[in-house]
């Protein structure tokens, strides 16, 4: 994937970059695999904001992605590589030998016409899905399950990957993109390769309006608010907030650890480094 730059015809264009979309082969999604999604504006069923800075954005149709890869032993051909407005990665449309059609996350180097399969004895090549027990140590993987049959939950963003480090008992040790090493059951599925669109991290939004197209609303600083809205608010003239940085709810931020101990903590072999 290449990054497209623009001539500085305006202040917003000057530093703006975007994907060249070279790998996209069609602009029309598969109709049977799209559904309408309703916008929430970050509100819950009571109408209260539960996720800040969400709202607006271009209208989108949701593409149903096969994260489970549970169509085993049935070979499929890659029919197209498509843009998905709901995620940073590209998606690949698969045509299975039995006539079924499904979308998967498009790994790096997957091309139209390639044949892939989900099987415990599949080849170790990008796009093939196998249980962790059948994958050799050191292999680059993505779309990793945490619970058997639930579908991939780890390493799904553009350019991300994990690495299989060890196998011990009924668990595999997987190094995640954050640097964390975690134990995952050997019967959990994972897909071979790195997620495509690896230059996504180099894209510069360029202007505020483009963030609004993506459904992201402005983030207002606490010190710019009134005391009723934020612990840092108020004061005569510009102030520093007058205390150590906190969230709008008074919880210390900027380095303060907020993760609670939970059942899954025992599966973490090494804490994240990022």
Curated annotation (Swiss-Prot):
<dbReference type="GO" id="GO:0016740">
    <property type="term" value="F:transferase activity"/>
</dbReference>
<keyword id="KW-0687">Ribonucleoprotein</keyword>
<dbReference type="InterPro" id="IPR012340">
    <property type="entry name" value="NA-bd_OB-fold"/>
</dbReference>
<dbReference type="GO" id="GO:0022625">
    <property type="term" value="C:cytosolic large ribosomal subunit"/>
</dbReference>
<dbReference type="GO" id="GO:0002181">
    <property type="term" value="P:cytoplasmic translation"/>
</dbReference>
<protein>
    <recommendedName>
        <fullName>Large ribosomal subunit protein uL2</fullName>
    </recommendedName>
</protein>
<comment type="subunit">
    <text>Part of the 50S ribosomal subunit. Forms a bridge to the 30S subunit in the 70S ribosome.</text>
</comment>
<dbReference type="InterPro" id="IPR022666">
    <property type="entry name" value="Ribosomal_uL2_RNA-bd_dom"/>
</dbReference>
<dbReference type="InterPro" id="IPR008991">
    <property type="entry name" value="Translation_prot_SH3-like_sf"/>
</dbReference>
<dbReference type="Pfam" id="PF03947">
    <property type="entry name" value="Ribosomal_L2_C"/>
</dbReference>
<comment type="similarity">
    <text>Belongs to the universal ribosomal protein uL2 family.</text>
</comment>
<feature type="region of interest" description="Disordered">
    <location>
        <begin position="223"/>
        <end position="257"/>
    </location>
</feature>
<comment type="function">
    <text>One of the primary rRNA binding proteins. Required for association of the 30S and 50S subunits to form the 70S ribosome, for tRNA binding and peptide bond formation. It has been suggested to have peptidyltransferase activity; this is somewhat controversial. Makes several contacts with the 16S rRNA in the 70S ribosome.</text>
</comment>
<dbReference type="InterPro" id="IPR022669">
    <property type="entry name" value="Ribosomal_uL2_C"/>
</dbReference>
<dbReference type="InterPro" id="IPR005880">
    <property type="entry name" value="Ribosomal_uL2_bac/org-type"/>
</dbReference>
<keyword id="KW-0699">rRNA-binding</keyword>
<dbReference type="Pfam" id="PF00181">
    <property type="entry name" value="Ribosomal_L2"/>
</dbReference>
<dbReference type="InterPro" id="IPR014722">
    <property type="entry name" value="Rib_uL2_dom2"/>
</dbReference>
<keyword id="KW-0694">RNA-binding</keyword>
<dbReference type="GO" id="GO:0019843">
    <property type="term" value="F:rRNA binding"/>
</dbReference>
<keyword id="KW-0689">Ribosomal protein</keyword>
<dbReference type="InterPro" id="IPR022671">
    <property type="entry name" value="Ribosomal_uL2_CS"/>
</dbReference>
<dbReference type="InterPro" id="IPR002171">
    <property type="entry name" value="Ribosomal_uL2"/>
</dbReference>
<dbReference type="GO" id="GO:0003735">
    <property type="term" value="F:structural constituent of ribosome"/>
</dbReference>
<dbReference type="InterPro" id="IPR014726">
    <property type="entry name" value="Ribosomal_uL2_dom3"/>
</dbReference>
<dbReference type="GO" id="GO:0003723">
    <property type="term" value="F:RNA binding"/>
</dbReference>
